[in-house]
Amino acid sequence: MKQYLDLMKHILDKGTDKSDRTGTGTRSVFGYQMRFDLNEGFPLVTTKKCHLRSIIHELLWFLKGETNVDYLHENKVSIWDEWADEKGNLGPVYGAQWRSWPTPDGRHIDQISQVIEQIKATPDSRRLIVSAWNVGELDKMALAPCHAFFQFYVADGKLSCQLYQRSCDVFLGLPFNIASYALLTMMVAQQCNLGLGDFVWTGGDTHLYSNHMEQTQLQLSREPRPLPTMKILRHPESIFDYRFEDFELSGYDPHPHIKAPVAI
């Protein structure tokens, strides 16, 4: 994951100091891209320990179409707690948009089911897209989508995915986002009987929070270790039938965890 450290260094060296919604302050760059060949290992950051349980359960939660944190709590995941209301609701965030995008005529579109069928039927389509950025419902969401839009691409029997992330907390959020979408790409590839291509991450406002600078320097002082391997142990009938125990990570030998505050 040298690419990740290179991004951190680029922000420190070339970034602009900016104010932000949370009042914390950031150093930011605009427009950055990284590419990960999913055949060369699972792109999970090794220069600090990442909480894989949270990454997997959050993805399964998105795929369930759920927008209440109850499922996350049942599985000891608390990463959405700061934004939930007293009943655990978040409004129509990722899961709602992925699985039940409302249309003006009263229908609801399951974008995940739709894109998988499109990949199978028309793999060369340039419309293999899922969007969480529903302008008509942004004001109902506890947090506007940061990872807003992703597109699949099939070539030579391999599936690739590109994510556009309009806003990126590089220290805390980005390691989760990369691993989550890499895993989603693996799952969709399995469902469509395709090999693995690349995961391409594209960032808009790509930033380090001002209260993450010490942690960033510590992480930059560490040498990246070999990437782990992720295996999917079962082939469920549907993208919606995966369980936590279907995923096996091996060879993950990270440096120790680095704690940092979340900007809310």
Swiss-Prot record:
The protein's annotated pathway: Pyrimidine metabolism; dTTP biosynthesis
Enzyme Commission code(s) on record: 2.1.1.45
Gene designation: thyA
CDD domains given in the database record: TS_Pyrimidine_HMase
Active site (record annotation): 146
Official protein name in the record: Thymidylate synthase
Family: Belongs to the thymidylate synthase family. Bacterial-type ThyA subfamily.
Protein residues bound to (6R)-5,10-methylene-5,6,7,8-tetrahydrofolate: 51, 169, 263
Top EC class for this record: transferase
Any GO molecular function: thymidylate synthase activity
